[in-house]
Amino acid sequence: DREHTPFRDVTIEDLDWEALLDTRLVFVTGITAALTENTAAVVRHFVDQAHCRGITVALDVNYRSLLWGPERAREVLEPIARMSNIVFCSVRDGKAVFDIESDGEQACRELRELFGVPTVVSTDQINGVYLSDAERGERTFPVVQMPVVDRPGAGDSFVAGTLHGYLGGDVVQGIHYGQRTSAYALTHYGDLTRVSPSELNIPPNTDILR
């Protein structure tokens, strides 16, 4: 479904880098890098420039086997991960792309050690969310199962919520935000989730006020 997207033909010269780099955080995904050699070069250039300027970089590995193989994915994404401040990589993608055979918190820690980055967040479907952080150590966040109306967008919603807290200085709170945002995403059709900060701060299991 991405075969004919115009973005496949983008080049480094096409973009206004001064405008794009006027930001607190640069966020890139493996899906973007996987489309073509052009997009891989654009993503790498973006991260190189952000890293040189001291801008925070976040990478979501988001491996898709229909777009590229694990060897090529690792060749492109590992250098980007090493320049990142926070990396999102599921336990499944850690196994497929980076040969991490462990599970749970250990897998998350091994990814952080491999990349040499401050923070890695790993999801593992219903088994949990794992954090490995240079300052906070390792933590596991249980996943609450719920009825699913429509799944697309839940992963992106989790990352968005987590980055909201991370940019506020608290990645742990960010993961809680991410879980709530992801839960919202599962309750409606479509892959665009709109959640306000006030909704994210509603305590879990709060009763309805009448």
Language model region names:
Residues 25, 31-109, 118, 127-128:
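Conserved beta-alpha-beta core of the PfkB/ribokinase-like small-molecule kinase fold
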Residues 1-40:
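Conserved phosphate-binding/catalytic loop of the ribokinase/pfkB sugar-kinase fold
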Residues 4, 63, 145:
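Acidic, glycine-rich active-site loops and adjacent beta-strand->loop/helix elements
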Residues 9-11, 69, 189-190, 197:
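Short, solvent-exposed coil/turn linker segments
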Residues 18-19, 79-80, 113:
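Structural alpha-helical scaffold elements that stabilize or flank donor/cofactor-binding regions
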Residues 48-49, 100-210:
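Conserved phosphate-binding/catalytic region of the ribokinase-like
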